[in-house]
Swiss-Prot record:
Keywords per UniProt: Cytoplasm, Elongation factor, Protein biosynthesis
GO molecular-function terms, A-Z: translation elongation factor activity
Recorded name of the encoding gene: tsf
Biological source species: Mycobacterium bovis (strain ATCC BAA-935 / AF2122/97)
Annotated protein name in UniProt: Elongation factor Ts
InterPro entries: EF-Ts_dimer_sf (IPR036402), Transl_elong_EFTs/EF1B (IPR001816), Transl_elong_EFTs/EF1B_dimer (IPR014039), Transl_elong_Ts_CS (IPR018101), UBA-like_sf (IPR009060)
Keyword Cell division (UniProt): no
UniProt function note: Associates with the EF-Tu.GDP complex and induces the exchange of GDP to GTP. It remains bound to the aminoacyl-tRNA.EF-Tu.GTP complex up to the GTP hydrolysis stage on the ribosome.
Coiled coil: none
Length: 271
């Protein structure tokens, strides 16, 4: 004879978010001991999280607050639209803004109420049955403009940008954030492009031009032209502005009296 009631099952479901059958089994296994049933479900949830470790987390959202930007991943867009998942992301980014962690591991140890970020993520993962992953975090401590972009009106933001800058023209900084979101700049200036990347681009440009049958004496000029094309695509300050393609981003920032010191761009599921 069962040592628990339907009300016990309902209460356990409300507390843990586990399914009805799982709650009934947990109560049966523990002879109706509610606290032990809760523990059993948490243990099972933790084990399930481990089993989910190999699943892909290509969905999710980005969130920003007070100079902090995070990416929190899940497996499906159904969960990305889930209110509890979005609330968790808001709590995580608030914890990041408060704690200013150096990296994801440090953020996982930050507090959300009486739990750590890592515990809060694991508990929601166990509850909804999907792998959840805190993928990355960025913290800027200067004057910051944040921009979040939605790919679809029914989905949470999937692209997030932080721009740290000096100057008083917030509108110009916002325009730069939009630029970064749209055109995916990778570097702020030429000086920020790693030497091995430049060498690789130069080598590719030279080999391509040679394969096209270009005259050997013309190769240096052709290579420099193509390398400049790479910089105009990858370097923020050298990109043509989306608001005025006859001017570079640097030219417009100079007029506005704004200097971008650094930026970061997160896109869900992308490097």
């Amino acid at each position: 004879m069962a040592n628990f009631t339907a009300a016990d099952v309902k209460r356990l479901r409300e507390l843990t978010g586990a399914g009805m059958l799982a709650c009934k089994n947990a109560l049966a296994e523990t002879d109706g001991d509610f606290d032990k049933a809760v523990e059993a479900l948490r243990i099972k949830g933790a084990k399930d999280v481990g089993k989910r470790a190999e699943r892909a987390t290509a969905e999710g959202l980005v969130a920003a607050k007070d100079g902090a930007l995070i990416e929190l991943n899940c497996e499906t867009d159904f969960v990305a639209k889930n209110a509890e998942f979005q609330t968790l992301a808001d709590q995580v980014v608030a914890a990041a803004a408060a704690a200013k962690p150096a990296d994801v591991d440090a953020l996982k140890g930050a507090s959300i109420g009486d739990k750590t970020v890592e515990q809060a993520i694991a508990e929601l993962s166990a509850k909804i049955g999907e792998k959840l992953e805190l993928r990355r975090v960025a913290i800027f401590d200067g004057t910051v403009e944040a921009y979040l972009h939605r790919r679809s009106a029914d989905l949470p933001p999937a692209v997030g940008v932080l721009v740290e800058y000096r100057g008083d023209d917030a509108a110009a900084a916002h325009a730069v954030a939009l630029q970064i979101a749209a055109l995916r700049a990778r570097y702020l200036s030429r000086d920020d492009v790693p030497e091995d990347i430049v060498a690789s681009e130069r080598r590719i440009a030279e080999e391509t031009a040679r394969a096209e049958g270009k005259p050997e004496q013309a190769l240096p000029k052709i290579v420099e032209g193509r390398l400049n094309g790479f910089f105009k695509d990858a370097v923020l300050l050298e990109q043509a502005s989306v608001s005025d393609n006859k001017k570079t981003v640097k030219a417009l920032l100079d007029v506005a009296g704004v200097m971008v010191t650094r930026f970061v761009r997160f896109e869900v599921g992308q490097a």
